[in-house]
């Protein structure tokens, strides 16, 4: 099982400071700009964590509000020291890098920061003397600058910002730079001249960059240990250059905090475009022969000719082996030792028996699929989404044997690619199967909370129907409301947002209403009142109104009334909202339109029982039409006794206000009383109930009074039924809430009916016997 170890003190303090910046580390200058308090000095370990955690909070926690001038806290290296920071996506703009230009950064990772322009290229020069590692992966606009040359007024009126490619920037002066990632950049960047000043590159990533002549790579043949050419359109000329990079044969190099293993990645996305180049037996043999000490190789996505593999009949028998001499891939038999990693995703080779590598990415089994998700998540969402889709099939059809690893990898992918439709669809679908009851015992509270967070992030960031449906279904795998309480307000807001469009997808509507109903069941009144103010009552009434117009009584209709029943329980404000927004008209219309829908009737009457418990609202129920409807429902046999019981409960509270409050001529009060007595006497005292009382307070207030004996009798019958049928639940509740002395007083009352007193004695007897049977007599 996953560990439920608490967060470190460092993590807790970092989180608190970031959520309370102007109350902890800084203050607001001119009510806008953050400034560090003058008496604070923060070392690099703390500064790096603050920045990196800030990025994580902004990208992963939608409830966290970013601060426009956050990076200004780190503008002065005399009080703050930054060394290694990882920034991503639209969070970072030119002015943010400009704010920290005086820092001696050693490591700067900028991933998919599309708001960065050529202004940031100039800022990068500020770090040239200290930078060892730089990633500009996916920063597609950083080599563009605005240009409004004279004589193009007409063009600039249409497009005031004319963008031109920067061609004169180079890495001149970046003398310490060893690691560089320029992957996923736009076409046209003059890579050769850009990189020429770098003398000692150890790792280079040119993913997606097309260059017909790769000869310039040989300038680092004595230093380059890791080369990534993912999605580069290769040719035999490229291969001839690659095999000259003899340092790719080297073993692990230590450079500062980094360990670089010799790695070659010539993989591709097989769906992105047509590639003429095919990996032949000759090419693979050449790579192994010339780069025999490679520790890691990725050839995923390539069309590989069949003569590369050993035939099934010639394969070594016995257990799968990583020994090169037994390799099912013929050219790899020349390896001196097994590879640490071999990327074979979406190639035929991954399905072979003997693969000379300790870790393989592929699509053959769960292990290979998880390795693929792990290897490609950060920079290759197109591959990651397909790998997660394979994991989805494994979790759905078979059994996931590495559950915790799978969950963590999917969570990471969803956080990393919050706005990628394919990953959000496949990831949310995989989470549904990975969190179901079969796997529940293996998951810690912390891990399940991480799942909830990432699901809510998906719902918040992506309005696509499939994502919304998958996320709602995944939430159904959790104990509601208990496991969602730490995000209670947020999840309700999201669900109500889903339900607001009345033409919403039917399946999502049904799931969302079910979740809303579960969320307001068994929670305290403060929660219910807060959700009511968020528009819960109004949203449910609109759904009901829409179903009425369609003349449809389905699960959405029934769940909506059930949700209203739950949210109005002991919450007068929500009851009043129900009345104010035409709830009684909808009740009458539903009753008329769907006379045979028993569960619907029960839910509606349960809700009206809650309304009737509020003294200030009861006058609104005192109309001839409403009283007649309630009286007629006393004789209903729908859903056992439930509809009749709830109708009698509504009338009992109305009767409790006395004859002077009876403001209608028809039906007469005495007539209704007689019908109530008859209904109560017709009920089976041993009836099993479809009801759940959290408190007896509304019932108990009907006991110590003589103004309405029938109300008193209904309350006593309710208690007798519940303590008889469900003694373990309701005897302790009645004793706890002081019901016993009230029942004893009732027995002494002259106005109480004899049958009511007799029933009260039986309730007292049941509870007394229960207390004696459950008394702890151990010593």
UniProtKB/Swiss-Prot annotation:
Taxonomic superkingdom: Eukaryota
Keywords: Acetylation, Leucine-rich repeat, Repeat, Ubl conjugation pathway
LRR repeats: from-to residues: 226-245, 246-281, 291-315
GO BP: positive regulation of proteasomal ubiquitin-dependent protein catabolic process; protein quality control for misfolded or incompletely synthesized proteins
A UniProt-annotated Pfam family: ZER1-like_2nd
UniProt key word Repeat: yes
Swiss-Prot/TrEMBL ARM repeat ranges: 440-480, 524-569, 571-613, 615-656, 727-769
The UniProt record lists the keyword Acetylation: yes
An annotated GO cellular component: Cul2-RING ubiquitin ligase complex
PTM annotation (N-acetylalanine): residues: 2
Protein family (similarity comment): Belongs to the zyg-11 family.
Function, as annotated: Serves as substrate adapter subunit in the E3 ubiquitin ligase complex ZYG11B-CUL2-Elongin BC. Acts redudantly with ZYG11B to target substrates bearing N-terminal glycine degrons for proteasomal degradation. Involved in the clearance of proteolytic fragments generated by caspase cleavage during apoptosis since N-terminal glycine degrons are strongly enriched at caspase cleavage sites. Also important in the quality control of protein N-myristoylation in which N-terminal glycine degrons are conditionally exposed after a failure of N-myristoylation.
Quaternary organization: Interacts with the ELOC-ELOB/Elongin BC complex. Part of an E3 ubiquitin ligase complex including ZER1, CUL2 and Elongin BC.
UniProt-recorded name of the protein: Protein zer-1 homolog
Species of the source: Mus musculus (Mouse)
Chain's gene name: Zer1
């Amino acid at each position: 099982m996953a560990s439920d170890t608490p967060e470190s003190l460092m993590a807790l303090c970092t989180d608190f400071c970031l959520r309370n910046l102007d109350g902890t580390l800084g203050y607001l200058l001119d009510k806008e700009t953050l400034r560090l308090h003058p008496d604070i000095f923060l070392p690099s370990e703390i500064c790096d964590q603050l920045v990196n955690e800030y990025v994580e909070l902004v990208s992963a926690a939608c409830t966290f509000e970013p601060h426009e001038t956050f990076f200004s806290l780190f503008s002065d290296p005399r009080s703050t020291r930054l060394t290694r920071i990882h920034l991503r996506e639209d969070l970072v703009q030119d002015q943010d890098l400009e704010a920290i230009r005086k820092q001696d950064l050693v490591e700067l990772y900028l991933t998919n920061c599309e708001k960065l322009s050529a202004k940031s290229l100039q800022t990068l020069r500020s770090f040239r003397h200290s930078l060892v590692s730089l990633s500009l992966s996916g920063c597609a606009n950083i080599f563009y600058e605005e240009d409004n040359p004279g004589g193009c007024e007409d063009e600039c009126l249409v497009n005031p910002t004319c963008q031109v490619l920067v061609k004169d920037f180079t890495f001149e002066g970046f003398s310490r730079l060893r690691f560089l990632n320029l992957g996923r950049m736009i076409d046209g960047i003059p890579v050769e001249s850009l990189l020429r000043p770098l003398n000692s590159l150890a790792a280079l990533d040119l993913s997606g960059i097309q260059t017909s002549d790769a000869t310039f790579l040989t300038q680092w043949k004595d230093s380059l240990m890791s080369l990534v050419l993912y999605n580069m359109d290769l040719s035999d000329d490229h291969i001839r250059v690659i095999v000259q990079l003899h340092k790719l044969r080297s073993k692990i190099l230590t450079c500062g905090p980094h360990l670089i293993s010799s790695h070659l990645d010539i993989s591709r996305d097989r769906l992105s475009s047509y590639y003429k180049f095919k990996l032949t037996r000759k090419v693979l043999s050449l790579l192994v022969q010339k780069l025999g000490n490679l520790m890691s190789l990725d050839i995923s996505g390539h069309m590989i000719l069949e003569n590369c593999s050993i035939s099934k009949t010639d394969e070594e028998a016995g257990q799968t082996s990583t020994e090169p001499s037994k390799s099912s891939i013929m050219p790899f038999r020349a390896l001196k030792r097994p590879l640490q990693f071999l990327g074979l995703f979406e190639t035929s080779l991954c399905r072979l028996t003997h693969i000379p590598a300790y870790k393989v990415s592929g699509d053959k089994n769960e292990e290979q699929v998880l390795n693929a998700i792990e290897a490609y998540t950060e920079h290759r969402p197109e591959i990651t989404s397909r790998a997660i889709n394979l994991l989805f099939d494994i979790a759905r059809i078979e059994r996931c044997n590495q559950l915790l690893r799978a969950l963590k990898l999917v969570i990471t992918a969803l956080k990393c690619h919050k706005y990628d439709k394919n990953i959000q669809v496949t990831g949310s679908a995989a989470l549904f199967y990975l969190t179901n009851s079969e796997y529940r015992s293996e998951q810690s509270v912390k891990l399940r909370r991480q799942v909830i967070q990432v699901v809510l992030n998906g719902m918040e960031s992506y309005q696509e129907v499939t994502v919304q449906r998958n996320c709602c279904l995944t939430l159904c795998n959790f104990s509601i409301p208990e496991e969602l309480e730490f995000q209670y307000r947020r999840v309700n807001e999201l669900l109500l947002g889903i339900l607001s469009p009345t033409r919403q997808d039917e399946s999502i509507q049904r799931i969302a209403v079910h979740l809303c109903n579960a969320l307001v069941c068994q929670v305290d009144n403060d929660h219910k009142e807060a959700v009511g103010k968020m528009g819960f009552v109004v949203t449910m009434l609109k759904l009901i109104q829409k179903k009425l117009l369609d003349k449809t009584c389905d699960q959405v209709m029934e769940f909506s009334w059930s949700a209203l029943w739950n949210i109005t329980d002991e919450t007068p404000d929500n009851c009043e909202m129900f009345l104010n927004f035409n709830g009684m008209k909808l009740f009458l219309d539903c009753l008329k339109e769907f006379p045979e829908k028993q569960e619907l009737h029960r839910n509606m009457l349960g809700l009206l029982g809650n309304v009737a418990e509020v003294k200030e609202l009861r006058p609104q129920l005192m109309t001839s039409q409403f009283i007649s409807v309630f009286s007629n429902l006393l004789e209903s046999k729908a859903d056992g006794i439930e509809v009749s019981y709830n109708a009698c409960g509504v009338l009992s509270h109305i009767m409790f206000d006395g004859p002077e409050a009876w403001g209608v001529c028809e039906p007469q009060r005495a007539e209704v009383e007689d019908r109530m007595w008859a209904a109560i006497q017709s009920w089976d005292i041993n009836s099993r109930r479809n009801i759940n009382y959290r408190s007896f307070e509304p019932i108990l207030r009907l006991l110590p009074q003589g103004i309405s004996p029938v109300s008193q009798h209904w309350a006593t019958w309710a208690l007798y039924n519940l303590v008889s049928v469900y003694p373990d639940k309701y005897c302790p509740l009645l004793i706890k809430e002081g019901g016993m002395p009230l029942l004893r007083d009732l027995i002494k009352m002259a106005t109480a009916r004899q049958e009511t007193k007799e029933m009260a004695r039986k309730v007292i007897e049941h509870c007394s016997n229960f207390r004696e049977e459950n008394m702890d007599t151990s010593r």
